[in-house]
Amino acid sequence: MRIGLTGGIAAGKSTVSARLAELGACVIDYDMLARKVVEPGGAALPRIVETFGGQVLRADGTLDRAWLAEHVFGPFAEPGSRERLDSIEHPLIYREAERLEQTERASRPHAVIVHDIPLLAEVVDALPFRFDHIATVEAPEEARIERMVATRGMTRDQACDRIRHQASAAQRLAIADTIINSTQPLEQMFEQVDRLYSQWNEEA
């Protein structure tokens, strides 16, 4: 059983993902994979330097994420910079995700495997595999902005820029067969997640 899990930035997807892992799902975290491919020695880092220039690196040779974010998501980002970054990172991330899924299925053929993909709505047609179900975690935009300012050290403008560069709620809902409302009390949200996992586990 292959599940796609998505949601807007700061919507609460990580909380849902962690709950599914507790229940026994194998969660493949695409944010973690994205960090891995840009680490020193990672396949994406030299190509990012080639594309964006040496200023994308810190003095210690690691990726300057703040610089890259400003030049990809910021108000003065060069047109097409997001697409260039995605074209470097995404194929490497998909390849590693497939490897992790194959490894899990070798030991647990009927496992519920959750692909935790923040930008699923943007890339769903480009993925080399399809999902049995897709769930999206949603919260009102203003609540998400407040969370980013409070917990991620962003300014309001930076938070709005991040949201602007993601798919809209309507686009996520168009690909999903399940909506998880993260503004409901945590206990109720966990009850919904638990029911979903039981359903997926039975189908697997």
Question: Across the structure, where does each feature detected by a protein language model lie?
Answer:
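Glycine-rich phosphate-binding loop of ATP-dependent small-molecule kinases
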Residues: 1-63, 74, 199-204
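Residue-level signal for inorganic ion chemistry
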Residues: 12, 31, 85, 114, ...
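Short, structured coil segments at secondary-structure junctions
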Residues: 23, 52, 129-131, 175-176
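An amphipathic alpha-helix signature
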Residues: 23, 45-49, 141-149, 156, ...
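Well-ordered beta-strand positions
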Residues: 26, 32, 133, 177-178
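ATP-dependent small-molecule kinase phosphotransfer cores
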Residues: 35-111
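ATP-dependent NMP and nucleoside kinases share a basic, alpha-helical "lid"
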Residues: 98-107, 113-147
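Small-molecule kinase domains that catalyze NTP-dependent phosphoryl transfer to phosphate-bearing small molecules
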Residues: 99, 123-128, 150-203
